[in-house]
């Protein structure tokens, strides 16, 4: 999965997919009542990027729905996975459940069109704080009470705080999550970061009793960093330059080992050689 980083304006969806992304990451900011409000990152952000592009969250969802619905004039067949980077650190811990409920309602109405031919992309809820695990339970409960528990088949999870892997496992246990787990590791492109924790995550993914299904590394803009991540065995890389990643994937060392994921590839299944 080539994951376009910080795609917060509707116009950027086409821009990143046309450069080779089959996945995008979108920032979600919340108001003080835990309503998802804008697709917005803010300052500071990655080096070489504008930090302040934004849309109202529900408007973005409607644009995203068009981009991921076959037959729509804006349909982008290659776009199969969306990571919502939930900026829930602005909330109190006891608001996490409400944030999950309100997020589910927004997606149900504006993206899934209440289960009536909505967008088809798989969705990852990426949460920065292990203490906010109730965001997941609130989200799940809401889809159930609204009569669409089947949509949870399209939803996966990530804790993005670079926490100790054992602590991440505990948070999922509390949230009742068994599967659909992506594990991120990374840092802003302005700073270097080693691959030690990525390798730990990959080892968990590949062990018989691991809880991780997929591992991605962020934010990868250089060819050398891309090669390091691929050599470590990641499933995805998040990038400001999808064309750079696509380029490296076409090198002889990688093109026999990796291919770009399509809609037929289940993002919740651990890849077995």
Curated annotation (Swiss-Prot):
> Mind listing the GO biological process terms from this record?
killing of cells of another organism; lipid catabolic process
Which Gene Ontology terms of cellular component type are present? extracellular region
Q: List the disulfide bonds.
A: 45-51, 47-190
Main enzyme class: lyase
Principal localization reads secreted
Q: Which reaction does it catalyse?
A: an N-(acyl)-sphingosylphosphocholine = an N-(acyl)-sphingosyl-1,3-cyclic phosphate + choline; an N-(acyl)-sphingosylphosphoethanolamine = an N-(acyl)-sphingosyl-1,3-cyclic phosphate + ethanolamine; a 1-acyl-sn-glycero-3-phosphocholine = a 1-acyl-sn-glycero-2,3-cyclic phosphate + choline; a 1-acyl-sn-glycero-3-phosphoethanolamine = a 1-acyl-sn-glycero-2,3-cyclic phosphate + ethanolamine
State the active site: 5, 41 (nucleophile)
In terms of superkingdom, the source organism counts as Eukaryota
Asked if the record carries the keyword Disulfide bond, the reply is yes
Q: Which family does it belong to?
A: Belongs to the arthropod phospholipase D family. Class II subfamily.
State the protein's name: Dermonecrotic toxin LdSicTox-alphaIB3b
Q: Which organism is the protein's source?
A: Loxosceles deserta (Desert recluse spider)
